[in-house]
Amino acid sequence: MRAVAAVLAALLLAGCTSGTTLPSPGPAQIDVDTPELRTMKADAGVEPCRPGEGEPVEGGLPEVTLPCFGGGADVDLSSLRGPMVVNLWASWCGPCREEMPILQQFHERHADQVPMLGIDYQDQQVTGAMELVQETGVTYPLLADPQSTLDGATPFPRMQGLPFLAFVDADGRVVHQEFVILESEQQLLDLVEKHLGLRL
């Protein structure tokens, strides 16, 4: 019995240190623009989604249009230009919950230079996700991809876990992407300098 408990503990520790494994896809249709979500979003002060004006580029974000989480303009990801940091998260992802205040801190200090965009990914608990947004104080724009449309959409890999970061340059190219659990704003600043060439 103790051996089984030890194995389970090791598996749980591995999950916490390496990210959260994705659950199976849920129902075919999940509404991310309901009156309740709109009210919660407004109360949280989440900024509106801003569609881009660019054309698709090689190595850029995929030609995938996602709805604005909690209502607002849909966004074709391929139209976006950086420098920008894109974060994929979900309410069921423990490490995502822990790092969201770090992302918000970065947003508050550097949004004019490097905007932050969050994507609630493969998350069927949309009310719980918006509650998490309220709890963590997130205000940067949020899209939703409850059916994991981005999974394998070039240049994204087959998603195995969260949290996930992508760095987009001024030409709209994804210059770097990785599964990473942020522990400090400085860690994110270092990644921005390394991959986007910006020292903030």
Where are these regions (language model features)?
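N-terminal targeting signals for export/organelle localization
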Residues: 1-67, 200
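Thiol/disulfide oxidoreductase modules built on the thioredoxin-like
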Residues: 134-138, 145-200
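Hydrophobic alpha-helical membrane segments, chiefly transmembrane helices and signal peptide h-regions
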Residues: 3-15, 83-84, 102, 121-122, ...
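Structural microenvironment flanking redox-active thiols in thiol-disulfide oxidoreductases
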Residues: 97-136, 146-153
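A short beta-strand-turn-helix
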Residues: 56-58, 63-84
